Amino acid sequence: ESLKTLGIRMQKAKEGWKSSLERAGVKIYYGEAEIISEQEVRVVADGETTALTGESLVVATGSEPSSPMALQLDESRGIISYKEVLSGKWLNVKDVVILGGNIEGCEFATLFKKMGAAVTILELGDGIMPMCDPDQAQFLKEEFEKQGIEVKTNSTVTQCQYNEEGKLEVICKNKADDTSQKLLTDALLVTGESNPVLPRGVEKLELVWDENNRIKVNEYMETSQKGVYAIGDVIGGITSANAAILEGKTAAGSIAGEKTPVSYKGMSYVCFTDPQLSGVGLRETDARERQLNYRVKKAYFSENMRALSLGYEKGFVKILVDVDKQTILGMHFAGDNISELISIGVLACHRDIPVKVVRDLPLAHPTMTEIIKEALC
């Protein structure tokens, strides 16, 4: 029932986005597009072809799931990606092994656990969530283990096949001690791998590509061909929705004659696990590697009045302060519903706002946001 309700809400959101575009004067065409030239695209839908022309072309066709070469996606063999999960067919499995302890893998671990499945995460590195601050990653690992989610680090899959009983046999190898283990499961979910989805006819543009088969662009999102731009997963880099939105605005500005180079400073991330993680700026490992003069400031939701009243008492905020400049280098949250708290950190890191200014903000009381001030005091 809850999934059905979520589907209804998402459909309303899509309708809202469509209405916003139409109010802005954007015409939407549904179908398969083919690039004819730098200034012409043809769209085929229901046997009819529509020719569209313009002075500029933006390639923003995203990416699709992929997998390591030795482990091809194959739904008939139980080796699946997020697309198969979101179709709904695999949500009722009793057991799942997830390859990758990245944001995608950890979010799906939370989903499957809430659906009642036994969950095992296999992570090639020595810890899950390598893009996060180490304190966040360790916190999430401990919370996962409390929930019964098994986390195996330094591990990868060497073999995967159905046995005679219809169970999927996954052979995982631990690179730390060179041992192997057989896991019996209903599905192997492969995460963190993707290939760019390229439109038909893109080769006609004779673009310059990088070594990962992504379109090369400059800081204005311009490709090697005049009037042709590219954004999002087709250019690689930071493959997140907020990065693609920023790149889209940069490309639009370039087309409109208001060129401003893209800046990823203050780019944040959110991991919708249980509990959640969010962050912006440098991790402590980054600050240490750069030999910066920094100080760690920390506060806990168990001491925040609003968090306690909501029952959100686990978790913390960790803030890295530049001792010399007295600005915020990074801000990292772990806890319940903390995805809504990261915006102040984004503003502080993006604009190099002094610590004193952030600390003295007259925030509403009682709110969870006050934990930022509590950490900086």
Regions found by a protein language model. Give the residues of each.
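Short loop/edge segments at beta-strand edges and connector loops
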Residues: 30-32, 37, 61, 81-83, ...
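Core beta-strand elements of the Rossmann-like FAD/NAD(P) dinucleotide-binding domain
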Residues: 47-56, 177-187, 224
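N-terminal Rossmann-like dinucleotide/flavin-binding domain of flavoprotein oxidoreductases
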Residues: 1-54, 132-155, 284-289, 374
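Rossmann-like dinucleotide-binding cores of NAD(P)H-dependent redox enzymes
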Residues: 8-14, 18, 86-87, 93-97, ...
